[in-house]
Amino acid sequence: MNIIEVNNLEFEYRTYDEDGNVTECNKVLKGIDLEIPQGQFVAVLGHNGCGKSTLAKHFNGILSPTSGKVFVKGIDVSDEEHIFDVRQTVGMVFQNPDNQLVATVVEEDVAFALENLGVPPEEIRRRVDEALKTVNMYGYREHSPHQLSGGQKQRIAIAGVLAMCPDCIVLDEPTAMLDPKGRQEVMKTIKLLNSQGVTIVLITHYMDEAVQAGRVIVMDDGKIIMDDVPKKIFAQVEKLKAHSLDVPQVTELMYELKKSGVNVPVDVLTEQECAEELLKLKHGKLTAKKEEEKENTSGINSEVAAEIRNLTYKYSVGTPFESTAVDNVSLAINKGEFIGVIGHTGSGKSTLIQHINGLLKPTSGEILINGKNIWDKDSDIRAVRFMAGLVFQYSEYQLFEETVYKDIAYGPKNMGLSEEETDKRVREAAQDMGLDEELLNRSPFDLSGGQKRRAALAGVIAMKPEILILDEPAAGLDPKGRDTVLDEIYEYHKNSGTTILLVSHSMEDIVKYADKVLVMNRGRLFCFEETDEVFSRARELEQVGLGIPQITRLSHILAENGMNLGEDIYTIDRAKKRILEIINA
């Protein structure tokens, strides 16, 4: 039996003038036909703007079709008389858990929808307890949601939907803002619910999540272009990449080996599958050679750009909620370095970086920029913020001006620069971030997601900070958009010599770009070393709630079975090179 049926669905967003006349139409869904059987686990992939979220919002009646029909258990979602039946059948979980939590106590938040439905108190108590136990959060029922980690908050959001006893849960990028441990927690919950018969529709940009589904749908330009089991979808590497999508690292490794003439299947999805196939190959022995260090193209020197001395920061000092976010951290960052900053949610990463440009003032300790304490009485904290630029996660929320040009120019103008110098910096920053000249006169709110992100970055770069701090600059972008933004940042770093601090939950991105990695754990500095050195401690990283690249996990499995690629396998290219050396030895 199908729980969701979509027949020739079309939807367009419309812009109206003051008189209610349509001034602009943007068709987002174009003739979608889809059936989802009860109990299925479906992953939906597609680049930003392809229509994934718009389609999902039709499943529980948040949006109504412009034309065509959507049925949930035979009920037309356009039928307003039965809209509450639809929404009780299909629950929805969004990307940002903070936008979904409404109460000050966990169990009250989970009970919120049930109270609105008029469910008897005894039944509310039973359902709330059951939902919290299902997502393994019963022990936190009396906690305040804002004190929980991202993964815990998202599980509370899922519990709130689960308490309504839906037959289907639609999750729109529920792990986009989570660390690796948080992602694992949420995916474990999703799979558990599916095993209990709940239909799951998961929208994601993470391919390792999509491979866990029973069915994968790929969208592009408002249409479904691929629909099959994960093995058959991800075996089509070139087609997926042409649509701005990625494949699991092990799938891409096998694809690259096959292109090099090695007889291996491409439709592998997990490290275990990949290892089994590689171990079948006849191979000689190879003494693993450590890869040469990355070429220094960024002008790193021993001159210190920023120094942190015995930094401690506490939130809510003097209240029952007092907590230490950063605990006695000391480190020095040299000029021209590209530093990756990693750590589990709540480890203190964001709190730490917000001290470098003076957004937060230490409870104790010192922050020095170019050898000068930024909180000395004679220090100009405003000037410090021009020297150390900070770009927040979802930086498009920093856009506010009428045009892209004015938005980028805002910082230089506030620095007191001349009109001529401001214009020069705006155009240079736009070029550095890959923004075409024609976009400068457009409203920033008319840009695509990736363009908005680059415009916000350009606004900080235009001030030419000596230190550029980036908090998850690629969060929420599709694989192609993510690579474009990060490549442009790296090119800017190489050309300008600017010191970069990149906060990320993607170990693959950190490995690709960072010279050194700063690891935070529970408010303390876990380690701060060269990238290769940090990721050679892969098992320790996993113990502190961090992920390691899938390709690294593969190398560990191979080593345990006699095929030693070395301790420094973090990229597909390096793994491919070592495997070819071994099988040809």
Predicted stretch roles:
Residues 69-85, 366-383:
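ABC ATPase NBD Q-loop/coupling interface
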Residues 122-140, 420-438:
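Conserved ABC ATPase "signature" region
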Residues 60, 357:
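Helix-to-loop junction immediately C-terminal to a conserved catalytic motif
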Residues 165, 464:
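Conserved catalytic motifs of ABC-family nucleotide-binding domains
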Residues 45-47, 342-344:
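The feature captures the beta-strand-to-loop junction immediately N-terminal to the Walker
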Residues 169-172, 468-471:
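Catalytic Walker B motif of ABC-type/P-loop ATPase nucleotide-binding domains
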Residues 144-148, 152, 443-447, 451:
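Conserved ABC ATPase signature
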